[in-house]
């Protein structure tokens, strides 16, 4: 059987990490929206700046906030995982402090509205920095 984790398709660098975005999805039992956010926070693409990722993260958070305003959340919050395991999982990623905060908000804040709003604010800060 082919080792699909030994390479990636496209310009992302997931395969060079011990823990890939798939591992985060499975460990934290993420819904599709949160899995997409996690992927965008973790990835580095040789062909793109982070600007587009931050814009997409902000957009996805906006959609989740819209869903939450419409009624009860159809998705469960991420499964709690000990912080020490989280720290081990991100160890070989060169995350900016803002990116780590994005991930922590996504994975650990139980108030989902607060999590998504915080993430939008962090993205606004990163977008402003990248455009300056």
Where are these regions (language model features)?
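Intrinsically disordered, low-complexity regulatory regions
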Residues: 1-132
């Amino acid at each position: 059987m082919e080792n699909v984790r030994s390479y990636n398709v496209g310009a992302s660098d997931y395969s060079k990490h011990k823990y890939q975005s798939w591992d985060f999805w499975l460990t934290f039992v993420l819904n599709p929206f949160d899995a997409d956010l996690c992927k965008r926070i973790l990835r580095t693409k040789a062909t793109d700046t982070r600007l587009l990722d931050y814009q997409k993260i902000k957009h996805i958070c906006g959609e989740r906030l819209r869903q939450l305003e419409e009624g009860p959340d159809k998705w469960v919050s991420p499964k709690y995982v000990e912080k020490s395991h989280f720290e081990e999982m991100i160890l070989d990623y060169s995350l900016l402090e803002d990116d780590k905060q994005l991930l922590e908000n996504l994975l650990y804040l139980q108030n989902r509205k607060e999590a998504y709003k915080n993430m939008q604010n962090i993205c606004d800060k990163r977008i402003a920095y990248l455009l300056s």
